[in-house]
Structure formats: structure tokens, C-alpha cells
Amino acid sequence: MAGDVNNEVNSKKRQGDTLAKERLLGLAEKIYNQFEEEVIPSVSLPSRTKANIEYSDESDVWVYGDRESERSAKTVKGAFQLLKTTYATDFLINEHLAHNRGSTLRELYYISEGWDYAKFKEQAESDRLIEDLELLTSLQREYFHMRPEEDGATMFGPIEISELTKRGARNIHCQKDVGEGGYQIPFNVENIEFKNHDASMIIAIETGGMYARLMENGFDEAYNAILVHLKGQPARSTRRIIKRMNEELEIPVAVFTDGDPWSYRIYASVAYGAIKSAHLSEFMATPAARFLGLQPSDIVEYELSTDKLTEQDISALRSELSDPRFESEYWKEQIQLQLDIGKKAEQQAFAGKGLDFVTEVYLPNRLKELGMV
């Protein structure tokens, strides 16, 4: 059985490598042909701005619209961008794909030190270029064997998986076979196969403190819940595994964050995608995900300990009123309420009501409101 899983995953990997090579070579060929035809080389990309985000009725997520920006050798800046694009493309084809190697985003920045004029000035520049290649090839960076620098998040709950590692496939029960930290989500979750589960819901949690509180209080057992620690703004792998569990296993998802504008964006990135990676929304976003809390109305109802909104918080909330991801009446009412009360609260504020309050009172009540229990 393990051998069959290995063969299947290895076959998919070879197919992915072949596709990535074809797409990257196609991009290089396009630029080369423009030189041959004595046309100033250029490539077009979707504009990565809030104004170019639109709702897809087909996939129920927010994607890029028709507005485009151009990378053209008409300008010195554009010429350097294309030069760096060709160097990176060559590296990915002849180092990563040809030799089954991989690099982190940080390593790519340092690797470019040997690229003469194509050297990146800062890592943000190399990160954007990989995003450009994703847009130009319609493939995720994992196809190029690019890894994120950050660790994946963790999850804990009643689900058994099979993960293909360099040492072969291994079966892991994410309650019985892991420590208190939970199962470490790998950067490429396509190497995971779901085996069995008894889960009734997935609770995606922003902070480590609340993740640990729910585990200590036995919430995963009481509600057959898979707990996922988002670690703040969630990594791609975290969003992808949530989407896969929701779509493939039909497990409902709720997102539990702090009660501030930055946390609402964490929910939005899980449910609808992020602006700078809207090209990946259909691959990573879970539009069925519900916002559990912490709501501004909870601050009022439960008289939670709060902090005063900063000017940056107020500006962010006002910006969200025009963000297409928050255009529903529910979000408009909650955001306006928060602006009116001028307060924000953390998840841990529930501890002021007792260590069991969040799992015995707040979450059961809120889950009933959402129709999840």
C-alpha cells in the first residue's frame, strides 16, 4: 500500500515538473522571439491592486480583474526586471527542475549575487519576481520547487493522514500520534493523502495562546474539531490544507481571530484570498469558511477587556469598508460598530471570564448561531 502511494505521488511530481519546465521555457521563448522579431521585449501581468479585485461567481472567491501592468524593456527599470526574470527562469529550469533540487525564497535572493546585473537589491524584489512567474505560467511556486522561509503551522484533531516524505510514506493520526504542539503542516500539502477522520468541524485559530487553550480544555474531543493554528497571517500551506479538508472531506470551517482590523484580514485571506496573491485564490481560498469571532459585538455583549483603537486601526477599518471582501451587511455593521466604540480586543480577553469560558460558553453559543452544532 505504501509503495502504491509512493508511486502515485512520484508520478504526479514528474508530471508537475514537466509542466513547469514547459511553461517556463514558453516564457523564455516568448522573450527570445521578441528579440528575433526586433520587437521591444515585454510581458503583461494583472495589476495587483485592490481596484483590480473582482468576485468570481464561478469559484466564489476574489480574483484579479482585467487591468494589467507591463514589464517592458522600453525603460531601464523594465529592462532590468526582464533580465532578472530570464536569469530566474534559467535557474529554476536548470538547477531546480533538472536536478530535483529546491530553494527557499531567502536562498534565491542570495543565489542572485552571482547574476551580475540581474542581482536582486532586496528579498522583496525576488519574492515579487516569483509571484510574477506564478502569474505568467499559471502555476504555483511549489511547481518550481520554491519553498517559503517560514515554518508551516500546526493542526490537532481527529484525522488520520498519509504524508510522503523523503523516507517514504508515513501514516499519522493528528491526535494520537503527535505531541502537544500538534502535527506540523509541510510546505507542500499535495504530498498529503487523507485517510480517515471523525471531524465535525475545523476551527482555524489566529493565536498560539488560544490554540493551546482549546487543546488544554479538550475542545477537539468534545466537538470532534480539527484545530488549526494559523500563526497570524496564514502561510499558503495552511490555507491550502484547510481548503482541501473542506472540499475533499466536506468538513465545515470557522475562523477564530482577535477582534481588530488586521485579524479580519486574516479571516478574509482564508475565505477569499489575499490581494497580492489573488491569482491563487481558487487554489487556496475557502469561501465556505465562516467568521467565528472575535466580533466587535462580542466586545460589547461580554464586556471584554479592550485596548483603544490606534489611528492605524481606524484607517484600516475605514479601508475595509471599501474592500470587496467585506462588502456584506454583516461586515459593514460590525466594522461600523467598532469604529463607534473605538475599541479592540484579543482572543485571550475571554480569560478574564475564567479559563473555561471560551470553550464552555462563548464558542458553543457562537457555533450554534452559525448553525455548526
UniProtKB/Swiss-Prot annotation:
Pfam families: TOP6A-Spo11_Toprim, Topo_VI_alpha, TP6A_N
GO MF annotation: an example: DNA binding
Annotated EC: 5.6.2.2
Residues engaged in binding Mg(2+): E206, D258
Catalytic activity: ATP-dependent breakage, passage and rejoining of double-stranded DNA
Keywords, comma-separated and alphabetical: ATP-binding, DNA-binding, Isomerase, Magnesium, Metal-binding, Nucleotide-binding, Topoisomerase
SUBUNIT field: Homodimer. Heterotetramer of two Top6A and two Top6B chains.
UniProt record similarity statement: Belongs to the TOP6A family.
Protein name, entry field: Type 2 DNA topoisomerase 6 subunit A
Species of the source: Methanosarcina acetivorans (strain ATCC 35395 / DSM 2834 / JCM 12185 / C2A)
Gene that encodes the chain: top6A
